[in-house]
Every structure is written in structure tokens, then in C-alpha cells.
Amino acid sequence: LTAIPLDGDQPADQPAERMEDGESTPNHPWFDPVKRCCTALCSRYHCLPCC
């Protein structure tokens, strides 16, 4: 078994963004575009993934 580090440009390297509340995660007020995650109120019904 060989482990290869992920390089960040493949779909498997970036978790799918789920939009269960009908809002687009990148447009969410708590979304940090630099870190590509949310900074507050992390839950399955709000901004995902959490920082």
C-alpha cells in the first residue's frame, strides 16, 4: 500500500460543498474565501465545511 500526498487540484482533494439550506456556501456571510471554509456557526444546515 502506498500513500501519495494530494496536490489540491483533483475533485477528491476538495470536499463537495453541500447546499442543504438553499444558499450557496461561497456567498454565505461566514464563508472565508481564502481558507475556503466557514468561520462561525458550523452545522449541517449552515456554511460547510467548517474552519
Swiss-Prot record:
Its main location: secreted. Expressed by the venom duct. It comes from the Eukaryota. GO terms for molecular function: toxin activity. Residues 1-27 are annotated as: Disordered. Residues 1-4 form the signal peptide. Keywords: Cleavage on pair of basic residues, Disulfide bond, Secreted, Signal, Toxin. GO terms for cellular component: extracellular region. It is found in: Secreted. The keyword Transferase does not apply. Residues 5-36 form a propeptide. The keyword Signal applies. Coiled coil: none annotated. Disulfide bonds join 37-51, 38-47, 42-50. Belongs to the conotoxin M superfamily. The cysteine framework is III (CC-C-C-CC). This is Conotoxin Reg3b. It comes from Conus regius.
